[in-house]
Amino acid sequence: MSILKVIHDRNAGMMPEVYKELTEEEMAGRILKIKKKFGARLFIPGHHYQKDEVIQFADATGDSLQLAQVAQKNKKAEYIVFCGVHFMAETADMLTSDEQIVVLPDMRAGCSMADMANMRQTNRAWEELTKLFGDTVIPLTYVNSTAEIKAFVGRNGGASVTSSNAARMLTWALSQKERILFLPDQHLGRNTAFDLGIPLSRMAVWDPIAEKLEYNGDMKDIIIILWKGHCSVHEKFTVANIKSVKERDPDINVIVHPECTHEVVALSDFSGSTKKIIDSINEAKPGSKWAIGTEMNLVSRIIQEHPDKQIESLNPDMCPCLTMNRIDMPHLLWSLEQIDKGEPTGVIKVDQDIAKDAILALNRMLTIR
């Protein structure tokens, strides 16, 4: 099955309505029964942004790459039920064996940021950038991207990046070529490049809709070309949010994810990956005060886990990631019962040609220290 077939089948095999009528107790009992029956043959990774009702059944929690790597090391599992979004399940499929079956409980669980860069747009951008800059551009893609985009990057000598290793990967990329095309999240690219000492005046933005480069200046000065994409959740944190919490309590620590805008990151006390945010709160002194700028399910979980600290969301009106939230207890149960019947649905299988090139991008990242 090609990756395009997988994407087009997102609405196939919809969960029967009867699952929504079950009580949480009924669903939990049936989920645990299947987990016990399958034992090590079943592995459920759960992303940090998942609801508590799902995370309680996860065999491992982490960010997208951590979970894919954990799945890769798990040679016993016949079925990997990935509680995350589509691109995460794709990465897990590419890093696991052909015999292992990766399942996404709800095929509608996509990622708006990953969908902001498709192959038609990327090929068009590459064509124009090559005309402008010749062979001086290397592509990097955030792991929050489709398998096809990772494959494009791999074919063209680039690598994938995470929010944890973005600085290291940009440094490596600039040792390879004069310029970087950073996909699909402009904010992570901009914040990371700025931290490395690259001024905003040397960063341009590629608009895939208008198919043009946004830059006021001499083209030869451009070092970073940022794809005009963003995370719909993290872009909602604002400078006004920071000013509001600081005016209310000057002692509060503001920590945000680098997918937030540059203005928000610049005004925050700390910024970093999901892991850095979690570690920072874990290591903070009792009684310390924190306003966190990241996904609401994770913030709520951190608040519950640290009653000795004063923690709140930087934006009190923030909603959880809507696509991540498509994975819920009814969909998890349905997915597991389909596996139990021998009729798994929501199977993610990346075309081998795409996987081969995408793995190049992933492996380059994993080997660069």
Curated annotation (Swiss-Prot):
Predominant subcellular localization, coarse grouping: cytoplasm
Pfam family, one: NadA
Molecular functions per Gene Ontology: 4 iron, 4 sulfur cluster binding; metal ion binding; quinolinate synthetase A activity
Reactions that this protein is recorded to catalyse: iminosuccinate + dihydroxyacetone phosphate = quinolinate + phosphate + 2 H2O + H(+)
GO cellular component: cytosol
The protein's Enzyme Commission number: 2.5.1.72
GO biological process, one term: 'de novo' NAD biosynthetic process from L-aspartate
Binding positions for iminosuccinate per the UniProt entry: H47, S64, Y142, V143, N144, S163, H257, P258, E259, T274
Pathway connected to this protein: Cofactor biosynthesis; NAD(+) biosynthesis; quinolinate from iminoaspartate: step 1/1
Record text on cofactor binding: Binds 1 [4Fe-4S] cluster per subunit.
Cofactor: [4Fe-4S] cluster
Disulfide feature: none
Compartments (UniProt record): Cytoplasm
This protein's UniProt keywords: 4Fe-4S, Cytoplasm, Iron, Iron-sulfur, Metal-binding, Pyridine nucleotide biosynthesis, Transferase
First-tier enzyme category under EC: transferase
Binding positions ([4Fe-4S] cluster): C111, C231, C321
Stated role: Catalyzes the condensation of iminoaspartate with dihydroxyacetone phosphate to form quinolinate.
HAMAP family: NadA_type3
Recorded family membership: Belongs to the quinolinate synthase family. Type 3 subfamily.
Name of protein: Quinolinate synthase
Organism field: Bacillus licheniformis (strain ATCC 14580 / DSM 13 / JCM 2505 / CCUG 7422 / NBRC 12200 / NCIMB 9375 / NCTC 10341 / NRRL NRS-1264 / Gibson 46)
